[in-house]
Amino acid sequence: MPGLYFEEFEVGRVFNHAIRRTVTEADNVWYSTATCNPAAIHLDEEYCREHTEFGQRIVNSGFTLGLMIGLSVGDTTLGTTVGNLGMDEVRFPNPVFHGDTLRAETEVIEKRESRSRPTQGIVTFVHRAFNQRSVLVSQCKRAALILRKPAP
């Protein structure tokens, strides 16, 4: 499904994204390694069993953030985004573990025309990710530069 143009976004609309993704150990190890993050809470099962309240490794929050936004792309900005302008209020209220299946929802909270780019507009979203038990695991506010509909 192609993304929406600036004019097609309505403030207050909530997208419940159909695509879900089960997070694997390979995802976590790959992401942590690729980003040079050697933290034991992501990579060392024995350390986590003995020294953390979770008793197991937690998924790297950078991966969780990227997955949450990625799950939204097909319904919202696929092919119509020019780029991200920024993210605010990034939160991880609960951990993600290997084997958790995440789903996401996106709310449009603001939109405005770009003063410097007449063929584009700015849309602000709140993304939320939930695990298989509907527990909130991640949330952020994201501003994106979105194409306007081409002139007929």
Role assignments for model-derived ranges:
Residues 1-86, 151-152:
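Hot-dog-fold acyl-thioester-processing enzymes
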Residues 1-11, 92-101, 105-152:
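HotDog/MaoC-like acyl-thioester-processing domains
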Residues 88-90:
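Conserved interaction-surface patches within small, structured recognition/assembly domains
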